[in-house]
Regions:
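Short, highly charged low-complexity linear segments
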Residues: 1, 70-77, 90-101
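Surface-exposed, Lys/Arg-rich phosphate-binding patches that contact polyanionic backbones
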Residues: 1, 8-28, 32, 55-61, ...
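N-proximal short alpha-helices
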Residues: 2-3, 66
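Generic detector of solvent-exposed, compositionally biased contiguous segments
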Residues: 11-17, 64-84, 117-122
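Short, basic amphipathic alpha-helical segments that act as recognition/interaction helices
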Residues: 24-49, 105
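Short runs of predominantly hydrophobic/aromatic residues within well-ordered alpha helices
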Residues: 26-34, 67, 71, 89, ...
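Short, positively charged interaction helices/loops
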Residues: 39-80
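Low-complexity intrinsically disordered segments
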Residues: 82-125
């Protein structure tokens, strides 16, 4: 069972930039990125699973904490299939973080007041 993953370089750059401009910690941004990716009606594409590993190293406990089983269930619902532990972490978690970071970047760039905009998105979850 894996306990660490490395994001893509692009995801790390996005998380670093938003972390610096919004003063939110990386682990908070990672959870928001996962939420935005899961919120998407689009399934993960094959290319989402083939991003580089040149970004930040993240610990499983930091990402999912006590809600590990909940994250796995949400990802299984999104994928519409059972995920083994090896598929869930790091494969699916990394894919959702990398895709979600891009979505988070779009929300931050075009959403006006970032935190207010994210709370408005929550109403649609």
């Amino acid at each position: 069972m894996a306990f660490k993953l490395k994001t893509s370089k692009k995801a790390a750059e996005i998380l670093d930039r938003i972390e610096g401009s919004e003063f939110l910690q990386c682990y908070t941004l990672v959870k928001l990125a996962i939420a935005l990716s899961l919120r998407s009606k689009e399934p993960l594409r094959e290319s989402d699973f083939h991003t580089n590993t040149l970004g930040r190293e993240l610990n499983r406990q930091t990402i999912t904490g006590d809600a590990d089983a909940l994250y796995k269930c949400l990802m299984e619902l999104h994928a519409q299939k059972h995920l083994t532990d090896e598929e869930f972490f790091p494969i699916y978690v990394k894919a959702h973080i990398d895709r979600g970071a891009i979505l988070l970047d779009q929300e931050q760039r075009y959403g006006g007041d970032f935190l207010v905009h994210l709370t408005e998105l929550e109403k649609g979850l």
